Amino acid sequence: MKKKHKRLLVASGIFFFLNCIVFFILTILRENISFFYTVSEAITLSNNQKPIRIGGMVVEDSVIRSESEVVFQMTDFNKSIVIKYQGILPPMFSEKSGVVVQGKMFDGNTFLAETVFAKHDENYMPRK
């Protein structure tokens, strides 16, 4: 085999190997990327039973606390959705603040949240 053919074969092998590595990295990242849908997008996915994340703002005067759960409305300023959550809310959770909820759609306008994340900007300062 000529030197030129060997170099071409080695270069092709390296190129193939690097493409395989990039493919596997992208496949793994696709499963772990944390994105969220807007409320309007989530309502169109109401038939979906897979866990999703929805991001939006908590509607003012919509938070209803009971012994077993918290119910509130979340909006993207276009549409609103009812969120039901059983658990302890994050300390930064408040009305008219940004939240991301993770869970499943119950019906067209109700979302059963398993986790609630309070969103904050880059100037976050924990409460003392």
UniProtKB/Swiss-Prot annotation:
The chain crosses the membrane at residues 8-28. Residues 1-7 are cytoplasmic. It is found in: Cell membrane. InterPro entries: CcmE, CcmE-like_sf, NA-bd_OB-fold. Residues 29-128 are extracellular. GO terms for molecular function: heme binding; metal ion binding. GO terms for cellular component: plasma membrane. The keyword Disulfide bond does not apply. It comes from the Bacteria. SUPFAM superfamilies: Heme chaperone CcmE. GO terms for biological process: cytochrome complex assembly. Keywords: Cell membrane, Cytochrome c-type biogenesis, Heme, Iron, Membrane, Metal-binding, Signal-anchor, Transmembrane, Transmembrane helix. It is a single-pass type II membrane protein. Heme binds at H120, Y124. Belongs to the CcmE/CycJ family. Heme chaperone required for the biogenesis of c-type cytochromes. Transiently binds heme delivered by CcmC and transfers the heme to apo-cytochromes in a process facilitated by CcmF and CcmH. NCBIfam families: PRK13254.1-1 (NF009727). This is Cytochrome c-type biogenesis protein CcmE. It comes from Wolbachia sp. subsp. Brugia malayi (strain TRS). The lineage of its organism: Bacteria, Pseudomonadati, Pseudomonadota, Alphaproteobacteria, Rickettsiales.
